[in-house]
């Protein structure tokens, strides 16, 4: 089975959802995930496919999924549930369900999604894995899903309700119990036939030709690693680093003589153990070593290159710098009284001593998150204190955060000696890296076992960072809306307004907005370091159909994804991107649309992004196909996707708040 645990959105910054999802917005989440999974799996042999579980199409909870410690989820109706998540109900209106939580699933279904996992919790009062409206009504009938549904960890409380509600596999029944239920009429034979057809058809579709379909009774460990994957993982990790601050063009580092390395996140946990799956217990706000993944159900990395490992390799390779390190977040800041006399006088190792003696100080901190429990805080006081302690004595403090979602930074981001900042966040059980350099800052995501190399590649300018934030970093935790619901009726009162949509609607100034990220330029010479610059121009809107006589509703026959005309291309929006700097770099152009007032929609919504690599002086054109779906809202009165006639705003920019070119568009419906 190919499966990929996606896509998850969450309305609360501390919830586990950010550890298991890709972003805080629904745009094309699944489309890109499916393309990546397909690219990964296609070259595999049938033997490899039979022996390896890749996780592609089975996602962690269809629609609202936020269960864990304090839960906003879906379950319980007067029954005695052992699992706390099953006592909790995610209650939300139909428009929010469709425009936020269902949206990325539509991409998955449209791209041939094979299987879906139903959630443990309740949705609007009904257990997710027994919910006929969610599984049959919306997923199978409304979106045209042709695959099968599996349960999350625990079987439904009512086995028959699960089968009748759409659950096709592992309902909790034995074969003999199912046969008896069919025989006595409590489960119609037609229901079981449909489930069987969906399972077999999906397997044959993914593992054709059918006569070669591998069905091993016993499986053995099989090495499917491609030696070249190491380089890919390293490059993907470094290109996923988000640079958030780079004061005085601190990065890339140019022939440094001495580095100070601080923080437990700089090295692997010396005594072990390696991370273990633990779904039940809160594991703390931070991890006691270099964090490369969120906790939970995942395949462990075969090895981990920490930042200290990577720096050691670079120093040993004749790079001309030395380093000292303190691999602790709470080491002595100032020296104790001196002992000894003359040449033998010493005052002991301290943070202040190593910071003073270092040309640049690298501070590594992290924020941990895991499946089975929510995060307790958005900032770690010990880590914040370490940053300030180092920055008090080091004029060039570079902060690298490996974190499982949002991590507040206002305790130190304005410190005059913090020159660089980067941020890494675990997504899909992976970690993002944010870098802040005092004077600068980057963020990194998903470098896994090559994490240390990926970070160091950016620090020394081997790779120009070009990634963008996939969530908003606020100035205060109080700026976020949505609160963890302990139990049991959890109302999604924020509706459509999560993350940047909330900040825009409420007029709140973030510290770093959704989509933000810096880059620097380096031509490989040690004395070159500056921002590369990009310009956006020539924004054009080309209708693909008559936009003055549009039908308001999508009414086509149901295909995979929904009504066929929902995917009709209405417009093509294009623009030119130019590199006006002196060296090569990459820009992520982001397209946002605003809807007419009558739509009562968020201020702006992401509807496209494109990453382009440009040589100095080069210009490339980007284009964004806009479907009917991109211009529609969910009409709760008719239960249909609807285009609201009126003026639409079209903006292209570098983030959700930094716009470079704007246009307006008027759509008329009949």
Curated annotation (Swiss-Prot):
Read off the InterPro entries from this record.
Cellulose_deg_GH3, Fn3-like, Glyco_hydro_3_C, Glyco_hydro_3_C_sf, Glyco_hydro_3_N_sf, Glycoside_hydrolase_SF, Ig-like_fold
* Glycosylation positions in this chain: 51, 141, 184, 248, 330, 417
Query: Under which pathway is this protein filed?
Result: Glycan metabolism; cellulose degradation
* Coiled coil segments of this chain: none
Query: Which keywords has UniProt assigned to this entry?
Result: Carbohydrate metabolism, Cellulose degradation, Glycoprotein, Glycosidase, Hydrolase, Polysaccharide degradation, Secreted, Signal
GO terms for cellular component: extracellular region
Record's signal peptide: 1-21
Subcellular locations according to the entry: Secreted
Q: What EC number(s) are associated with this protein in UniProt?
A: 3.2.1.21
- Which reaction is recorded as catalysed by this protein? Hydrolysis of terminal, non-reducing beta-D-glucosyl residues with release of beta-D-glucose
* Positions annotated as active site in the UniProt record: 152
* Positions of the UniProt region annotated as Disordered: 65-87
Q: Which GO terms describe its biological process?
A: cellulose catabolic process; glucan catabolic process
EC main class here is: hydrolase
Q: Does the keyword Secreted apply?
A: yes
Q: What terms describe the molecular function in GO for this protein? A: beta-glucosidase activity
- Gene3D superfamilies in the cross-refs: Glycoside hydrolase family 3 C-terminal domain, Glycoside hydrolase, family 3, N-terminal domain, Immunoglobulins
Question: Superkingdom, according to UniProt?
Answer: Eukaryota
**Entry's family note:** Belongs to the glycosyl hydrolase 3 family.
- What is this protein for, i.e. what is its function? Beta-glucosidases are one of a number of cellulolytic enzymes involved in the degradation of cellulosic biomass. Catalyzes the last step releasing glucose from the inhibitory cellobiose.
What is the protein's given name? Probable beta-glucosidase N
């Amino acid at each position: 089975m190919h499966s990929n645990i996606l896509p998850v959105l969450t309305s609360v910054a501390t919830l586990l959802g950010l550890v298991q999802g890709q972003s805080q917005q629904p745009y094309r989440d699944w489309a890109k995930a499916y393309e990546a999974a397909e690219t990964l799996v296609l070259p595999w042999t049938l033997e490899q496919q039979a022996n390896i579980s890749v996780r592609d199409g089975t996602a962690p909870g269809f629609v609202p999924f936020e269960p864990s410690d304090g839960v906003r989820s879906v379950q319980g109706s007067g029954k005695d549930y052992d699992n706390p998540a099953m006592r909790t109900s995610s209650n939300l209106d139909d428009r929010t369900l469709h425009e936020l939580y269902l949206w990325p699933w539509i991409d998955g279904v449209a791209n041939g999604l094979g299987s879906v996992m139903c959630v443990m919790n309740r949705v609007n009062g009904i257990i997710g894995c027994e919910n006929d409206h969610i599984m049959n009504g919306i997923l199978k009938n409304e979106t045209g899903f042709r695959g099968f549904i599996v349960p999350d960890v625990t079987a439904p409380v009512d086995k028959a309700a699960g089968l009748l509600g759409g659950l096709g596999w592992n309902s909790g029944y034995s074969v003999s119990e199912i046969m008896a239920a069919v025989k006595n009429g409590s489960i119609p034979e037609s229901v079981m036939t449909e489930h069987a057809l969906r399972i077999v058809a999906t397997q044959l579709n993914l593992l054709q030709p059918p006569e070669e379909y591998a069905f091993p009774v016993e499986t053995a460990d099989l090495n499917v690693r491609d030696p070249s994957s190491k380089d890919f993982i390293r490059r993907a990790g470094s290109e996923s680093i988000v640079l958030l601050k780079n004061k005085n063009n601190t990065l890339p580092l140019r022939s440094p003589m001495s580095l100070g390395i601080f923080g437990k996140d700089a090295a692997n946990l010396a005594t072990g153990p390696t991370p273990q799956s633990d779904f039940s217990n809160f594991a703390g706000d931070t991890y006691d070593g270099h964090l490369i993944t969120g906790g939970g159900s995942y395949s462990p990395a075969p090895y981990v290159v920490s930042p200290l490992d990577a720096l050691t390799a670079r120093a040993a390779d004749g790079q001309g710098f030395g380093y000292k390190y303190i691999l602790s977040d709470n080491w002595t800041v100032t020296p104790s009284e001196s002992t000894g006399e003359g040449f033998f006088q010493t005052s002991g190792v301290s943070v202040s001593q190593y910071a003073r003696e270092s040309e640049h100080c690298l501070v590594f901190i992290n924020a941990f998150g895991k499946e089975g429990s929510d995060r307790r805080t958005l900032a770690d006081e010990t880590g914040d204190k370490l940053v300030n302690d180092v920055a008090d004595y080091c004029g060039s403090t570079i902060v690298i955060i490996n974190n499982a979602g949002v991590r507040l930074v206002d305790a130190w981001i304005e410190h005059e000696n913090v020159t660089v900042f980067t941020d890494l966040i675990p997504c899909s059980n992976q970690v993002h890296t944010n870098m802040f350099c005092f004077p600068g800052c980057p963020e990194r995501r998903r470098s896994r076992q090559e994490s240390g190399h990926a970070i160091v590649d950016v620090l020394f300018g081997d790779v120009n960072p070009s990634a963008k934030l996939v969530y908003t970093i606020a100035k205060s935790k109080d700026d976020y809306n949505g609160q963890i619901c302990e139990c049991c009726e959890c109302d999604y009162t924020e509706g459509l307004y999560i993350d940047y949509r909330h900040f825009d609607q409420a007029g709140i100034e973030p510290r770093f907005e959704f989509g933000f990220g810096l880059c620097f330029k380096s031509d490989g010479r040690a004395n070159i370091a500056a921002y590369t610059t990009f310009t956006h121009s020539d924004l054009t809107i080309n209708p693909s159909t008559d936009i003055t006589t549009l039908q308001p509703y999508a009414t086509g026959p149901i295909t995979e994804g929904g009504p066929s005309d929902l995917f009709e291309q209405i417009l093509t929006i294009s623009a030119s991107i130019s590199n006006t700097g002196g060296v090569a770099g990459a820009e992520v152009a982001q397209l946002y649309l605003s809807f007419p007032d009558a739509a009562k929609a968020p201020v702006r919504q992401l509807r496209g992004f494109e990453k382009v690599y440009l040589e100095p002086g080069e210009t490339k054109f980007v284009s964004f196909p806009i479907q009917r779906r991109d211009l529609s809202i969910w009409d709760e009165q008719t239960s249909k996707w609807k285009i609201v006639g009126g003026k639409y705003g079209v903006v292209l920019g570098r983030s959700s708040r930094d716009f470079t070119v704007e246009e307006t568009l008027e759509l008329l419906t009949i």
